[in-house]
Amino acid sequence: TDTLLYDFKKRYDLVVGNPPFSKLKAKDAKKYLENNINKNTTNTFEFFLEKALAISDYVSMIMPKAILNTPEFSDTREILSHKKIDCIQDYGENGFKGVLVETICMFIDTVGIPNETKVESLTLKQSVIQKQKYITDMKYPYWIIYRDKFFDNISQRLEFDKFTVFRDRQITNSNTTQEKKADCLRVIKSRNISDDGKEIVDIPGYDSYIKKETVEALSAYKYVGNQNVYLTPNMTYKPRVMRNTKNVVVNGSVAVLIPKEDIHLTEKQMEYFSSDEYRKFYQIARNYQTRSLNVDATSVFFYGVLKECCNG
């Protein structure tokens, strides 16, 4: 019997689960999505979670940490925010030995009224009692489970949601070369952006180039020479931002930040992204994740521009 499709005739006191985390093909997911609230996922764990919430008064379930922040699970977060979440245990990458997936366990009272949530981190070795509405605050694009006064103070100094993001998926080792030629553009990779974001660093054996005629057919080409966009390394807790420069193109290890409005960052505003203060803030904003650190459509929200009044 397929548990996900089975029509349970009675309600249960408790469901405990460690469901499979696997993405199904659209045609295989179709039968499960019919009765699912979240129509934007094909991940089996989410189907099991929704099923458990529907048939039980209490649910304790292991799930990927990505549920906290990825766009795919925004509808799931909306469902959960109305349940009473007693505890979120964050295992980081230590949940399953040898499995490079970050996991959490959520303890959910499906009939209770949201109040306080205990957030426990096995990797940070810390435990804190949070107001559930504080960590699931709708003014942010996803849950911030380690939110604190420091985070709130920095938030007051920043203007959020100023950029959209582009990340290349076409420039690879197969269409680039380490040989610099006249008909080539420099490919900027994450390590080429200095720690303070002020210069492009040459790294022998790492630097690469791509033929102009090759890159002209790629999506990233539209940003070549556009000095109104900004570059930031992807997958790092050492963010830094630099203005795009001429005759370069970026690969997927660097995200292109595209201003939503006609804004031009000052030197101080760009410098702030590589400050210790902002980097500490950014770790909290990313829930101390170690795997899913892409600068994506939701996390780019937190590339906040320092307010001019705070530039001193």
What are these regions (language model features)?
Residues 1-162:
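Signature of N6-adenine DNA methyltransferases within the class I
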Residues 149-312:
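Polybasic, glycine- and aromatic-enriched phosphate-binding surface used to engage nucleic acids
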